[in-house]
């Protein structure tokens, strides 16, 4: 009878343990998927149906008359062709991109600066500041727009009173009613509401950077700017990319502040893509199909920005 060498027995035992471990890990993975399947299915149902249905509407001629009859004629992509030929849509896209670049750029810079200050503050001061910073984030967007609309009021606005009493202006400024300042006025209101999210995320990321790295760089004679550029900023890049993606997607869809402060005006100065889709869909003649097409184009642009951000992140990692 053949006998197995001790090495062969050891290898067989290890193979058996590895096989059982692999089977156990597979079983745990399958169990995790099975337990999350109801939630995933519900999310797909809630999210996928509106997306697919909007895509269906964007390829058909849909108005009030068609809704009443329940008959949506196929229009061979005419909604998209008319959309791309509409100069108002081009203007809305230009305003949206300008608004997004302004809002996201300012928000990221301010978030990093404020988070760095909080990181240097005492524990009690940092906690109090974070609590106060969270207040604007809890304000509903439409309420935030109404608050800033009152602040921008030409005759009774708080902003004009403060600037006039401090001697910075000689007469009231119509912030929301001037074509040169309307979009920027909305941007300020939007940043005030959304900045806290970015600040808290960046501050949490700063807490995870080992102090030993900064201490070693200080010993080597690195200045504060060199430490920030070589240590802090590279380690913050993954978080910054996440903020860029989230804030870009939300800024592209800005609507409530536009509705409350300018309603797309004066003229077309603050006419953004979400407002364009809203007016197409809910204002006579209620071109619902073309409104859905504009929403799809907007989603495509957001996706392109997200891809660019992710490519930037991978390039930084490489």
Q: Which sequence ranges carry the predicted segments?
A:
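A structural signal for multi-pass alpha-helical bundles of membrane permease subunits
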Residues: 28-318
């Amino acid at each position: 009878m053949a006998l197995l060498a001790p090495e062969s027995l050891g290898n067989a035992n290890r193979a058996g343990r590895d096989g059982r471990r692999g089977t156990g890990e597979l079983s745990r993975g399958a169990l995790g998927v099975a337990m999350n399947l109801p939630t995933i299915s519900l999310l797909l149902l809630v999210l996928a149906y509106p997306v697919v249905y909007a895509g269906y509407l964007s390829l058909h001629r849909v108005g009030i008359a068609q809704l009443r009859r329940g008959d949506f004629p196929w229009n061979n992509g005419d909604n998209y062709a008319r959309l791309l030929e509409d100069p108002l849509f081009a203007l809305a896209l230009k305003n949206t991109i300008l608004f997004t670049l302004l809002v996201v750029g300012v928000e990221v810079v301010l978030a990093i600066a404020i988070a760095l200050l909080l990181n240097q503050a005492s524990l009690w001061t940092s906690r109090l500041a974070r609590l106060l910073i969270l207040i604007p984030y809890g304000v509903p967007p439409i309420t935030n727009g109404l608050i800033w609309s009152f602040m921008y009021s030409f005759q009774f606005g708080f902003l004009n009173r403060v600037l006039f009493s401090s001697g910075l202006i000689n007469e009231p400024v119509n912030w929301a009613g001037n074509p040169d300042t309307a979009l920027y006025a909305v941007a300020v209101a939007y940043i005030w509401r959304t900045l806290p999210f970015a600040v808290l995320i960046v501050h949490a990321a700063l807490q995870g950077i080992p102090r030993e790295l900064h201490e070693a760089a200080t010993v080597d004679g690195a200045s504060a700017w060199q430490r920030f550029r070589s240590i802090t900023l590279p380690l913050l890049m993954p978080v910054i990319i996440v903020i860029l993606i989230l804030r870009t997607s939300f800024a592209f869809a800005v609507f409530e502040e536009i509705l409350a402060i300018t309603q797309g005006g004066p003229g077309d100065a603050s006419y953004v893509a979400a407002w364009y889709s809203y007016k197409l869909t809910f204002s006579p003649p209620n071109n619902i199909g073309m409104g859905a097409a504009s929403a799809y184009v907007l989603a495509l642009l957001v996706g392109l920005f997200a891809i660019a951000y992710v490519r930037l992140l991978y390039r930084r990692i490489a």
